[in-house]
Design a protein with these regions (language model features):
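Long, compositionally biased intrinsically disordered terminal regions
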Residues: 73-208
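N-terminal ordered "arm"
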Residues: 1-57
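Short amphipathic beta-strand/extended segments with alternating polar/hydrophobic composition
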Residues: 44, 52-60, 199-207
Length: 208
């Protein structure tokens, strides 16, 4: 069987951190690669929150749109190998978010998102069952942002994804790292850009 490839020029450390978190949350997570620009690859990874996370690296992918096991990709990045595993295209849940066209709606201070996540975690501990936090908590809208006639709700699942994937800097992070998140929208898609990656959610049609 053929093997997919990804050659990384820079950004491997950040991608490794995201993949390690994603695999820690879901050992069966799937990664998908898009050649965003001639020398930039956007790596998407599934999460248990019905949210797709993404991070960009400088490099080239052997086959644009290829999907592989996130665990296989993680091991390859750790080892510095270009071979990243066998194709898993059939396991990817739906379409990728658009590559461009998103409208910036608002900028949120990191501490606001962290406070929301803390409250959400407390509720999750209080009401979680054997299957984890209840679906109603994940769907709950915790913020509404709007600009130029466009309004979107931010569900708790996006907040949980940002914090559980380590996309938000901690208090000890260097001061040159931004302390805000940007919320953007395009059609049914909502995107939150954090300092260490982005998360996407389809607001009207579930990815999973």
């Amino acid at each position: 069987m053929s093997t997919e490839t990804l050659h990384i020029e820079s950004g491997a450390q950040g991608l490794q951190a995201l993949l390690a978190r994603a695999v820690g949350l879901d050992a069966q997570a799937i990664a998908r690669l898009r050649q965003y620009a001639p020398e930039t690859v956007e790596v998407f990874v599934t999460t248990p929150f019905e949210v797709v996370a993404a991070r960009r690296v400088a490099g080239t992918v052997g086959r644009d749109g290829a999907s592989v096991s996130a665990k296989d990709l993680l091991h390859a990045v750790k080892d510095g190998r270009d071979e990243i595993g066998t194709p898993r295209d059939a396991s990817w849940p739906g379409a990728l978010p658009p590559a461009s066209g998103f409208q910036l709606l608002d900028t949120l201070p990191v501490h606001v998102v962290r406070d929301l996540a803390d409250k959400g975690q407390a509720l999750a501990r209080q009401f979680s069952g054997p299957a984890g936090p209840p679906s109603s908590l994940m769907k709950q809208s915790v913020l509404t942002v709007e600009a130029d006639g466009t309004s979107v709700d931010i569900p708790m699942r996006l907040i949980f994804a940002c914090t559980n994937l380590g996309l938000i800097p901690g208090f000890s992070a260097p001061m040159d790292i931004p302390r805000h998140l940007r919320v953007a929208a395009l059609g049914r898609w909502v995107r939150v850009d954090a300092p260490f990656g982005s998360v996407y959610h389809s607001s009207r049609l579930s990815l999973f």
